[in-house]
């Protein structure tokens, strides 16, 4: 009986040690970005369900607000390089929004919901659902300057 108890206690101690090590490792290494842009500039085309354009535009507004309120200088630089446009034309029965990024801030996160989560962690789930429900497609074009 005592031997079985030692095995259980040892197992719990090992699990706690492993978990503590994982927490320390994650605290030391910031999360790697899920979407970086590698060129000098980029054009991101979003296809949005036509009845969800107001929802998507509220996501864009929240993104701009998050970048503007961030304490990180890189986020301010990202905001300065973003320009959103809406096309009067539709593609595949979807509204077309174009995000021009010029210049790209190298090695930085460009995933919309992750950027919003940095500043608005409580609201991000609601924003994500609006984004997901409005989304019909996306294309990313990386651009490099021609000498």
Where do the model's predicted regions map?
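Phenylalanine-focused residue identity feature
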Residues: 17, 46, 56, 84-85, ...
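An amphipathic, aromatic/His-enriched active-site/gating alpha helix that lines ligand/cofactor pockets
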Residues: 63-81, 93-94, 100-147
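Boundary at the C-terminal end of the N-terminal hydrophobic targeting segment
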Residues: 20-29
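N-terminal secretory signal peptides
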Residues: 29-81, 85-86, 142
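Divalent cation-coordinating acidic motifs and surrounding scaffolds
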Residues: 90
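Bacterial N-terminal signal peptides that target proteins for export
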Residues: 1-20
């Amino acid at each position: 009986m005592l031997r079985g108890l030692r095995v259980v206690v040892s197992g719990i101690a090992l699990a706690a040690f492993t978990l503590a090590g994982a927490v320390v490792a994650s605290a030391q290494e910031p999360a790697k970005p899920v979407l970086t842009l590698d060129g000098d500039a980029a054009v991101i085309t979003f296809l949005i369900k036509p009845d969800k354009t107001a929802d998507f535009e509220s996501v864009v507004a929240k993104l701009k607000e998050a970048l503007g309120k961030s304490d990180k200088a890189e986020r301010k630089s990202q905001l300065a390089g973003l320009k959103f446009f809406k096309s009067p034309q539709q593609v595949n029965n979807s509204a077309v929004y174009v995000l021009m990024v010029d210049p790209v801030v190298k090695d930085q996160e460009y995933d919309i919901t992750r950027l919003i989560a940095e500043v608005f962690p409580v609201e991000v789930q609601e924003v994500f659902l609006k984004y997901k429900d409005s989304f019909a497609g996306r294309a990313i074009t990386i651009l490099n300057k021609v000498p």
